[in-house]
A protein has these predicted regions:
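Hydrophobic transmembrane alpha-helices
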Residues: 1-54
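Membrane-helix interface segments
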Residues: 5-8, 50-55, 105-111, 138-139
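Hydrophobic alpha-helical transmembrane segments
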Residues: 9-14, 39-40, 53-59, 85-90, ...
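Short helix-perturbing small/polar motifs within transmembrane alpha-helices
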Residues: 14, 21, 78-125
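Interfacial aromatic-anchored transmembrane helix boundaries in multi-pass membrane proteins
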Residues: 23-33, 61-95
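Structural signal for the C-terminal ends of transmembrane alpha-helices
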Residues: 47-48, 98-106, 168-172
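Alpha-helical transmembrane segments and their lipid-water interface positions
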Residues: 56-60, 68-71, 95, 99, ...
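Membrane-embedded alpha-helical hairpins and interfacial helices in multi-pass inner-membrane proteins
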Residues: 74, 107-179
Length: 179
């Protein structure tokens, strides 16, 4: 097995671990706490190739589904996927895929930022849909609760991911996987 093949198996697990660890960091701002889950998904997506990034986000969901306490605040279990926040989580693999496809070592910071914003937008679409259909909220309430409080924090997360990605990829450039 080649070194890159080994890495393509290890990196999704490492990415899922990063997402799980950062999901436990909760910033209690206002009525709705901010977590670093989307920051982690965006960072993993910006650094890894699309396949590994998508697998990392999917593995994270599988670990949570089987009951490991990897979701925000130590949550886990299959019931999470039937609650009002299910759409946010289920959008993570799509977030990872889109962001990873649009980001690479030579991507300018502003394009990395836009890639994060585009991928993160999919998370908000999923979240608003699940708040509406599973949480029985009206559309306006779902947007007010599930999007509005997160706009500025997520733009900041996207900016940080964009600023951090280039130096991280530069540091890893000597490894063939990251070329």
């Amino acid at each position: 097995m080649t070194q890159n093949r080994t890495l393509s198996l290890i990196l999704p697990a490492f990415g899922a671990a990063i997402i799980a660890a950062l999901a436990q960091i909760i910033i209690p701002i206002g009525a709705v706490p901010i977590t670093l889950q989307t920051f982690a998904v965006g960072l993993v997506a910006a650094v890894l190739k699309p396949r590994e990034a998508t697998l990392a986000a999917t593995l994270y969901l599988i670990l949570g589904a089987i009951g490991l306490p990897v979701f925000a605040g130590g949550g886990g279990g299959l019931q999470t996927f039937f609650g009002p926040s299910a759409g946010y989580l289920l959008a993570y693999p799509f977030f990872a895929l889109v962001t990873s496809v649009l980001t690479h070592a030579n991507t300018p910071i502003w394009k990395s930022f836009l890639a994060f914003v585009l991928g993160d937008s999919l998370v908000f679409v999923g979240g608003i849909l699940s708040l509406h259909f599973l949480g029985k909220m009206g559309w306006s309430a779902a947007v007010a609760v599930g999007l509005t409080p997160f706009i500025i924090p997520d733009l900041l997360k996207g900016l940080i991911v964009a600023l951090v990605t280039k130096p991280v990829l530069k540091a890893l450039k000597n490894h063939s996987y990251f070329n």
